[in-house]
Amino acid sequence: MTNPLRGEVIRLYKNLLYLGREYPKGTAYFRERLKTAFMKNKDVTDPEKIQKLIDRGDFVIKELEALYYLRKYRAMKKRYYEPEH
C-alpha cells in the first residue's frame, strides 16, 4: 500500500470505529464487522482499487451519520409531539 493511501485507510478506519460507538446493535458487533471488512481487503495493492474502497467507506460514513441523525430526530419528535392515533 502506498504511503498517502495508507494514511487515508487508517483515517477511514478510525472514523468508522468512532462512529460505531452509537451503532444500534452495539459497539462490539460493529467493531467485529468493521475489522472483518478491512481484513478482507488487506491484500489489495492496486491504488485505484484502494481508492474505490476508501470512497465506499466514506459513503458508509455518510450513511451512518444519516442513520444517527434520523434516530435523534425521532427521539426529539417523540419528546415534543403527542403520538397520533
Swiss-Prot record:
This is LYR motif-containing protein 5A. GO terms for biological process: negative regulation of oxidative phosphorylation; respiratory electron transport chain. Belongs to the complex I LYR family. Pfam families: Complex1_LYR (PF05347). PANTHER family: ELECTRON TRANSFER FLAVOPROTEIN REGULATORY FACTOR 1, GROWTH HORMONE-INDUCIBLE SOLUBLE PROTEIN-RELATED. GO terms for cellular component: mitochondrion. It comes from Danio rerio.
